[in-house]
């Protein structure tokens, strides 16, 4: 599976049971990246997406996603699923928000290599950085 996560400068993902931020252009970019393949997420994340035929919703989405399928992760630790992850795509907000849920960045030091970096302008963020990690 290919996981996509949004993080701040300190790898924060959520605060007080809410996402730190969101961006319309980023959501459109995620949809393009999938190329129509399934995009798995939980019901909380689905609320920010338009109806789309490739979005699959399940609270156990990280268990259901198959090879080559995408997962948008906002509020879970992906470490238990590391063996099944083919690629990690981090979208950096390039700012710091309050956070109490974090991405376990130590995972990236276990054989992951930064392959691509690209910056783009979002709808509510001047600069979002996309980082693609592979093994």
Task: Please name every model-derived segment.
Residues 1-135:
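Enzymes that bind and transform nitrogen-containing heteroaromatic metabolites
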């Amino acid at each position: 599976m290919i996981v996509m996560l949004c993080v701040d400068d300190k790898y924060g993902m959520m605060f007080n049971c809410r996402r730190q931020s969101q961006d319309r252009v980023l959501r459109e970019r995620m949809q393009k990246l999938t190329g129509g393949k399934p995009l798995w997420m939980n019901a909380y994340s689905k609320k920010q997406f338009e109806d789309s035929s490739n979005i699959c919703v399940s609270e156990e989405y990280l268990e259901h996603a198959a090879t080559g399928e995408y997962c948008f992760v906002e509020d879970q630790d992906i470490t238990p699923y590391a063996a099944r992850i083919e690629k990690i795509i981090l979208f950096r907000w390039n700012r710091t928000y309050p956070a109490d849920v974090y991405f376990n960045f130590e995972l990236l030091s276990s054989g992951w290599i930064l392959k691509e970096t690209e910056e783009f302008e979002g709808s509510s963020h001047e600069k979002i950085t996309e980082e693609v990690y592979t093994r």
